[in-house]
Amino acid sequence: MIEREYHTYLKLERGLSDNSIVAYKLDFNRLKTYMEEHQIDVVRATFDDLQAFVFETFKGIKSAKTQARLLSSIHSFYRFLLYHRYIEQDPSELLEMPRVEKHLPEVLSLEEIDAMIAQIDMSKPEGHRNRAIIEMLYGSGLRVSELTELRLSNIYRKEGYMRILGKGSKQRLVPISPVADEQFGYWLKDRSQLDIKPEASDIAFLNHYGRQLTRAMIFTIVKRLAEAAGIRKTISPHTLRHSFATHLLQNGADLRIIQQLLGLEYTVTTEIYT
């Protein structure tokens, strides 16, 4: 009962993305299993119980980010219990978060981005598609998940913008660059020649089987182009998004505008640009 309520709380009240909810569920199950093994009701756990769990669990977790997420999940569960009056005091309140070492993402120069684009074989059926993908990741700062879920019905080419469904199902409007729009127009013609599966009829980017592109496919496209261009940096679709924000900032854009374009809710997330 409480578990179902908690999952609903994560989705509807916290507005977390599906990926975040899956991670929080896994963390909760880990906590619940530990408490059951020690004959402790997870709802009635004390600070000492939680501290023992953290101490024991962290032995097998080397990543500070994973440790931080686990503690965040614990805090989230007990805040939920407190808010819904299952408990009178939050036993996780004094649990400390580990300091997460910040690693700045790689930034691509304009020359490097141009070099990647130059590697796209425009004679192939996927040429215009891949060019449009790079232009939208960099020119609009999309997350890879936002790109794979992009719908034709949310692209307003005449008006020059897209409606993006971001993390936590939050919507925002982002501009489409003239180059991205041009390449996307070419891709639409190629797309119309595919045997498009019914479930993918409104999906913007498809593979040659007429199915939705996956995040792994986008990663592969970006990585192969970077390697072909001789770029030795660690590159991912997020690198293009980060480069978009960095170049805007270097050219005098307001940090708050960049935050809105990226769909970042919390200022702390944009600290890497300050």
Predicted ranges, named:
Residues M1-T274:
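Conserved catalytic core of the tyrosine transesterase superfamily
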